[in-house]
Amino acid sequence: MKRAFNVENPDFKLSPLTGMTRQHYIEMAKYLLERAFTHIDSINDPLTFPPVPGKTYPQPDDPDWRYRSLEFEALERTFTLAGPLIHVDPEVEIKGIKLRDYYSLQLYHALTPGHPNSLPLPEDLPDSTYQFTCEFGGLFKTLLLMPETIWTHYTEEQKNEMVVTISKWAHHRTTQNNWRIFNIVTLSFLKKYGYEIDDELLKSHLLWVASYHSGNGWYLEQTYNYYSISLFIVYTT
């Protein structure tokens, strides 16, 4: 396996800085997933990456929820690559594993209460903010854009099972200005598909984010920097 992705036959007329075309991005996504899937052997294996001692989480003696967070972050971040590939080619496979089948199964396990790999619910954890909220935002950003990749392939019974976890995290407390985007995205997904949400909470998050517009397309990140409007558009499309 190549140690780095190479842009072959670049088109600098189309993309002056990188030379990358749409096909290059498709090939790069496959390359990255091929690397990621070296860490699983079958469709039943949760995706995780090797830890870097002292640098990555979880640390020794961390509670179980930290391991679920590790798995969910790997699953969501790689689905950001897999989703568009499934959208382009529903039959796409990596390492002999059909991506739609893998992500459908693993997300169902993660979001169904009671499964050994299911995420904890907010009420089962100390009252705080958690990485789960961030990953929900990323996941449902992709599913708002491309629901046909996996969401529409679940049965109504499966969806209703998963919505319990989705809704509880969508309504859970958040932090900082930009993190509200994650709640906004997840709440918006639920609302779009007819599930009950707290509309006033969604409105509150939206107004809060809008109040931090600082001009010329920049939004203040409450504690330390600014986010460009492009990020907000990407996450709220």
Residue ranges and their predicted role:
Residues 1-112:
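Extreme N-terminal leader/anchor segments
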